[in-house]
């Protein structure tokens, strides 16, 4: 992605479910490959597909660190030490790879982590939300009910905004 970040509020309202749905499918594929094994996702991430822009005056080590920071994954991590260690083997302080940091008392508040039961609740919610949305579509429900979050709404880039009849007032 460009600068896309995982937004839990947008996810909750069904506006940012694609990443979780893809992860669900990846879990299903792995379960088929490894019957009888429990597949536990480590996290849900966006990867920055861009050329990182960093200062050319940096030495090689600082340059690599700056590039890693620019390309750091964004999303949510299952908060389990073994999972975090596999995602970033050199994890200490602030990770250059995942959205996580450590303090003397544990993980930093800026870390984007969910306890295993919270992470599983996100997956369960996504399955229910997806099923509900599919059911509504199959029943023919197609109302003009665009979302509104902050300064954005569903009409902003909609190609049908001029003909749908929805009053944005």
Which residues are covered by each model-predicted region?
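RecB-family 4Fe-4S metal-dependent nuclease core
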Residues: 1-169
């Amino acid at each position: 992605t460009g600068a896309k970040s995982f937004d839990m509020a947008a996810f909750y309202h069904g506006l940012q479910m694609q990443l979780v749905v893809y992860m669900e499918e990846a879990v299903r594929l792995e379960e088929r490959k490894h019957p009888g094994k429990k597949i536990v996702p480590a996290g849900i991430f966006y990867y920055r597909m861009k050329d990182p822009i960093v200062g050319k005056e940096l030495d090689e080590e600082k340059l690599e660190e700056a590039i890693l920071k620019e390309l750091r994954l964004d999303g949510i991590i299952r908060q389990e030490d073994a999972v975090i260690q596999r995602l970033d083997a050199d994890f200490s302080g602030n990770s250059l790879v995942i959205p996580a940091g450590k303090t003397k008392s544990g993980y930093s508040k800026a870390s984007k982590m969910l306890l295993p039961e919270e992470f599983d609740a996100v997956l369960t919610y996504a399955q229910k939300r997806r099923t509900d949305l599919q059911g509504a579509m199959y029943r023919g429900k197609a109302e003009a009910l665009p979302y509104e979050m902050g300064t954005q709404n569903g009409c902003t880039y909609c190609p049908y905004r001029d003909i749908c009849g929805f009053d944005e007032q």
